[in-house]
């Protein structure tokens, strides 16, 4: 759907009425790349502006695990990052300045430096195991984003267990940090994938479907609002308000 049409609809859409946790989804926080047709690289300047807006507008940035608790404040926001890009380390420094927390979903294949890039976004530098440990020591949460970043809905039973349960065991052993959250690669999941995440011991599993979340304990269908390089500050504000949540229906149709 054309960006101009999305913005026009969002400008007229009502704000979300229900209280809950809005989970933001970021990827790389870095300069533009001509190959980045999906807008995965949000600039450092834009990211800082967005964090400043959260601060001045009175949003409360909470850990993703806040969703496991009782019903929340209506302006709760959780911040998440997928793929474990090295540029996310700079984002962590900005978050510290504002006193914000976040969850970083990492992939051991990338942490090991064995990328064998198959997509343009895999060519970007990724953080190391030492970087992941530094995030844990800095008070951030590390979550799992699978072992190698496949489409889990296409994995056979044995590989699915390794990608979902095996990565949890590996991260916990290497980082000495309990892993309770999972992010589905590409946002793709089905009943079998969700059940595997539950049996592996995760309490939360994140999608890339727009929407707001009402805390009610363990959840394997966490909605997230993606922030992209194409978002202006007014777009970011509208996403916080839920004015883009109608896109979830469009995602379902696709």
Task: Give names to the regions the model predicted.
Residues 81, 85-100, 111:
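Acidic/aromatic-lined carbohydrate-recognition and catalytic surfaces
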Residues 25-29, 107-109, 145-147:
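Short loop/turn segments at strand-loop or loop-helix junctions that form parts
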Residues 1-80, 85-88, 154-254:
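C-terminal active-site subregion of NodB/CE4 polysaccharide deacetylases
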Residues 110, 127-162:
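Histidine/lysine/aspartate-rich catalytic loop segments that bind and position anionic ligands
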Residues 100-122:
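A short, conserved beta-to-alpha structural element at the edge of catalytic cores
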């Amino acid at each position: 759907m054309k960006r101009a049409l999305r913005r026009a609809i969002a400008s007229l859409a009502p704000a979300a009425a229900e209280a809950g946790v809005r989970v933001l989804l970021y990827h790389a926080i870095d300069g533009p790349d001509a190959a980045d047709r999906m807008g995965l690289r949000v600039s450092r300047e834009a990211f800082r502006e967005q964090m400043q807006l959260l601060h001045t507008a009175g949003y409360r940035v909470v850990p993703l695990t806040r969703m496991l608790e009782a019903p929340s404040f209506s302006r709760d926001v959780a911040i998440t990052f997928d793929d474990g890009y090295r540029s996310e380390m700079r984002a962590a420094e900005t978050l510290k300045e504002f006193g914000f927390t976040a969850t970083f979903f990492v992939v051991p294949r990338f942490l090991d430096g064995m990328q064998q890039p198959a997509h343009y976004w895999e060519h970007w530098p990724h953080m190391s195991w030492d970087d992941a440990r530094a995030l844990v020591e800095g008070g951030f949460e590390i979550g799992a984003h699978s072992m190698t970043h496949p489409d889990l809905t296409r994995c056979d039973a044995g590989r699915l267990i390794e990608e979902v349960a095996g990565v949890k065991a590996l991260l916990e052993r290497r980082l000495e940090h309990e892993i309770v959250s999972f992010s589905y690669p590409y946002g793709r999941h089905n009943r079998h994938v969700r059940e595997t995440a539950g049996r592996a011991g995760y309490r939360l599993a994140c999608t890339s479907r727009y929407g707001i979340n009402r805390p009610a304990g363990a959840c394997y269908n966490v909605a997230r609002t993606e922030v992209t390089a194409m978002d202006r500050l007014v777009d970011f504000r509208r996403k916080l308000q839920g004015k883009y949540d109608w896109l979830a229906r469009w995602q379902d149709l696709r």
